[in-house]
Amino acid sequence: MNLTELKNTPVSELITLGESMGLENLARMRKQDIIFAILKQHAKSGEDIFGDGVLEILQDGFGFLRSADSSYLAGPDDIYVSPSQIRRFNLRTGDTISGKIRPPKEGERYFALLKVNEVNYDKPENARNKILFENLTPLHANSRLRMERGNGSTEDLTARVLDLASPIGRGQRGLIVAPPKAGKTMLLQNIAQSIAYNHPDCVLMVLLIDERPEEVTEMQRLVKGEVVASTFDEPASRHVQVAEMVIEKAKRLVEHKKDVIILLDSITRLARAYNTVVPASGKVLTGGVDANALHRPKRFFGAARNVEEGGSLTIIATALIDTGSKMDEVIYEEFKGTGNMELHLSRKIAEKRVFPAIDYNRSGTRKEELLTTQEELQKMWILRKIIHPMGEIDAMEFLINKLAMTKTNDDFFEMMKRS
């Protein structure tokens, strides 16, 4: 029996299962307590129980396996991992572990891990000789992540404009600069769907910090990947803990040569949370930002890299501007030069209800010649020369109308060549 499978089972089915095992009064209990009771009963009959989760090591040396369903929040059904197991398998925070567990004994509160079967979806022996993330060699992104799906839908238009304006590669550190109500969340959903469709081999994680609960639900239903969220009614310390868990998990997977993509909405809110949590240093920048507060969100964003030894970590984050808050401007200014791809959304275009509201002339990718063929690059540059003299709204309307006539960007370039 598997703890994770039970967590995904509806309560009504759990109650039926519990009653068939001879348990009583289940209808009045919380879901976690029902799972607890079922597993205890199951273990009494001498059968094995299995569980998995992402390890968080606490200051005392022991750790717990947290579940992604509860966005890595501490809960009663976490699995205890002893310090000896952590030392033996050289485990670190963020390792995804699955194995055999046992129910709590008298006086204990948590399930405990008995035997480690897998570390990061790999045998435990293989995890011992991996290179630490900090020692891997970072390179420029050189393998393209295509967004275009080629189905001719209106959603695909956004992906195609993105491919033309600022191509994305594996290991990109991208910043989507957006004023409020310019369609940044829709753009992220679009990117997530394109990645799931075109690149199923990549591990996709969507991290929503300080977002509205209904947007979290919408994202979970639309995206085929792991959606981890901390909504705006949660304290800043919770935002920070969730972000740290996600980035640590991503680093551990990159050490195992996986391609990981994190979509973060938004880095501004994350930086605000760090600003609240960090102890006051006494030096305060403009807008009330503590001088030490931006070090950790920069470390988060700076983790994105293409790795020479294999694997990559791509982070595409949104940054808010024009919110009327001086702090947001300062945070954006700090992050401005750090990314190697920038996509600017425009309030003016969005107000005219032209989507995607991308400011084509200001968007772009550094070293885009590594991601595209020489021929494609020439065509993209010619397109920029045509679009540059137009105003931002006219440019976007012109591009969308022309793209709508064709199904793929290759067809669009052919049409451009003929005309």
UniProtKB/Swiss-Prot annotation:
- Recall the GO molecular function terms of this protein's record: ATP binding; ATP hydrolysis activity; ATP-dependent activity, acting on RNA; helicase activity; RNA binding
Q: What Gene3D superfamilies does the annotation carry?
A: 1.10.720.10, Nucleic acid-binding proteins, P-loop containing nucleotide triphosphate hydrolases
Q: Which UniProt keywords apply?
A: ATP-binding, Helicase, Hydrolase, Nucleotide-binding, RNA-binding, Transcription, Transcription regulation, Transcription termination
Q: Return the annotated region ranges for RNA-binding 1.
A: 61-66, 78-80, 108-110
For the site RNA-binding 2, which positions are given?
Answer: K326
The record's CDD domains line, in alphabetical order, gives: Rho_CSD, rho_factor_C
Residues noted as binding ATP in the record, renumbered to the chain: G169, R170, G171, Q172, R173, G174, K181, A182, G183, K184, T185, M186, R212
Gene Ontology cellular component list: cytosol
Specify whether Transcription is a keyword of the entry. yes
SMART domains the record matches:
AAA, CSP, Rho_N
Function in brief = Facilitates transcription termination by a mechanism that involves Rho binding to the nascent RNA, activation of Rho's RNA-dependent ATPase activity, and release of the mRNA from the DNA template.
Which PANTHER family does the entry mention? TRANSCRIPTION TERMINATION FACTOR RHO (PTHR46425:SF1)
The protein here is known as Transcription termination factor Rho
